[in-house]
Amino acid sequence: MTRQHRSIPLLLAFLLTATAAWAAIPLKTVTGTLDTIWGDSPDGDTYQRWFLTDDQGASIELMVEQLPPRGFAEWNRQRAEVTFEDDPLLSGPKRVRAVRLVDVGENNLRADGSAPISGSKPWVSILCKFSDIAAEPENLSFFQNMYGNNPGQLDHYWREVSYGAIDVVGSTAIAWVDLPRPQTGYIPTPGSGSNANLSLLFNECTAAADPFVDFSNGGSPFEGINMMFNGVLDCCAWGGSRFATLDGTSRSWRTTWEPPWGYRDAGVIAHEMGHGFGLPHSNNSDGDSNPYDSPWDVMSAAVAYSISDATYGRLGKHTVSYHKDRLDWIPANKIYTADSDGQHVVTVDDLAQATVSNYRMIKIPLGGNVLYTVEVRDRTGGYDGNVPGRAVIIHHVDPARAADAEVIDGDSPAANFADTEGVMWKVGETFEDSGNEITVRVDSSTADGFRVTVTRGSATDIFADGFESGNTSAWSDSQS
């Protein structure tokens, strides 16, 4: 007993000392631009890194432990005042204590944190060689033609996926240039880890290319920069954005860092460019840490169930309806929102079709920014030709998750990969969320999609007036 009593003041003394030490960590506040970058590994691992670049161009890597309610997009590419721990004895990312957005009125975020993208978005590929690696894995024409408008090339791809909302006309590539350092000068252990010095790679790759490219593009700056390296980086290919001043233009440049395996498959390039456009991962719903488990989205399993091209390898698929809506690629009159109690009978057409007569997606709000989405996928178009099948696909969306959209799987437990019958809702099948009193029933197949009934509220409330035996055609909603 005596020994136990002695341990209590000792423990309290330790806790007080630790608390005092934590409280004594110096804090620093810096104003600059926040950018996030995703790392994508072929082994299924993913990483997300945050950087704050101040007005003098100095970049600080941050440790972000909690995202805002609207998810990463609320901070990404935004000007902010960030307070972080600045312990001189510790190296590595700085732990964030507070973030306050500034110049909020100048950004184009919508209420859900998304940012519309439209028009021509030219990119430039800069090809950078480590000083100790002489190989040039592909020639200049390979990278220049990658941006073409033939099937399998990126201008054609982004036009189809966005329904013509964006293109990459004006994109180009410049010939291989030499970096001033060897591979290990940027990556401590090439091919492993997640600690490539992305800032140094960006700074020295763009500097090496600067004599040969005008990043300001004659007053119409390039939208993004694809950096193509001639050796592996760390674990990953990386995509996101990076604030910098290049040729007099200061902005968050949409940016990718690509090892050779990244540009051998155009689907990987499309995935990383998608991060550049502000898209996170989507996922299946098995609860593991691997976000590459959905073959329905280029932002998940980028090259699974993909079409192959003789030159550009495995191509990207379409992204999911929620992501297209985030970027404002689906017109409001092609989105049905089931936000009231009752039955909503809706005809939904295949998401990959260039034009549709009916709706492209259904939204079912759950409160806040959380919702279900309903879309139809089929083996159609130039890039969805090998998806697992023709079906209604339902996602649960929460922007506060790292992978915001998760495919609903009717099987329990959920499959490890979302290519099973459990995720493909077909005629006669019903998804039910009893807690929110929501059902989604697939009623029938149409020429271009499916007729779906969304029911909100309990059946007792819905049919309290006894009209269920009458004509319900007034509750239907389709377009002609």
Residue ranges and their predicted role:
Residues 64-70, 241-263, 336-460:
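Non-catalytic C-terminal accessory/binding modules of secreted extracellular proteins
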